[in-house]
């Protein structure tokens, strides 16, 4: 079945902007939101899974630029508010498809997903039956069985039932866990799905771990249930900190005029607020020697001139130098270019009398870069790029 009605309802709930971002990053929504959708219940929050750390970070960057409010950030998940929606990015692991996500889930009633790569639902064979019967069937391969044990009460409050054999299966699966440190115990006690009992041991260190002592510590604690509604958050100050925690791949970095920059997940050069956990340091001179930048200019009577200032000329084989002194209130003292993958974003892209020029920039002339746009005080004009060639650039960029 196509479940077109449920798909339309999901898209309407998420909104066009978010749907397009989820498509671009080939995300998968799975779990409670899909269960609520098929049970005709109100959706409380949306758990979003990704195929790679690159896709997860790309999605977060897109959302960050549209004014989201991050409410919690743990090693396993990041929860943020986008307009009225509560979105939880799951990043303790990355998944190739819905079935691999289901392998980590605890109950079949959660095993529903919508894949934005295929724009189709994937449902476990017992998903609809067990939801209609309101019964819990446990998956012993779940990633966090202690959390599953805690979640039983949540489902019984929603009038689901669990048989004694199924409950025993959860307990026995918990017994099979290998836990040798407080950190491993905390990892099994929460940090996602609204279960945050890892906070029971947030002040404990890894040395001298003893499970029986840990059990006794719980008995001695007097804590209100509301205490466990908020997760143990990782500290972060900006987007880079969040990306550093989610990204498992090395980040290419370089220092330009004493400022730290990185090659972002979108491939563009941008200033780096904090150092990534793992990095590949690029040689700055080598980077500028091998990198070309681009700009659309007016071609008239054989001359290449600026669209912004018709008297400013770019001559192939010569240096072009910005006029005036740099200030923060105007374009004075700066020339503006695009990285190769961002030429379509150029202010003058599509102008009838426009042509694309290729330039080199030296480190000493570099001013700033962000989202594919580059500022410099001067450049060396290399050549005029043919229309067929730059259209191939755009075609290649759009196919990525």
UniProtKB/Swiss-Prot annotation:
<keyword id="KW-0548">Nucleotidyltransferase</keyword>
<keyword id="KW-0808">Transferase</keyword>
<keyword id="KW-1090">Inhibition of host innate immune response by virus</keyword>
<keyword id="KW-0945">Host-virus interaction</keyword>
<comment type="function">
    <text>Counteracts the host Gabija antiviral defense system. Probable nucleotidyltransferase.</text>
</comment>
<keyword id="KW-0899">Viral immunoevasion</keyword>
<dbReference type="GO" id="GO:0052170">
    <property type="term" value="P:symbiont-mediated suppression of host innate immune response"/>
</dbReference>
<dbReference type="GO" id="GO:0016779">
    <property type="term" value="F:nucleotidyltransferase activity"/>
</dbReference>
<protein>
    <recommendedName>
        <fullName>Gabija anti-defense 2</fullName>
    </recommendedName>
</protein>
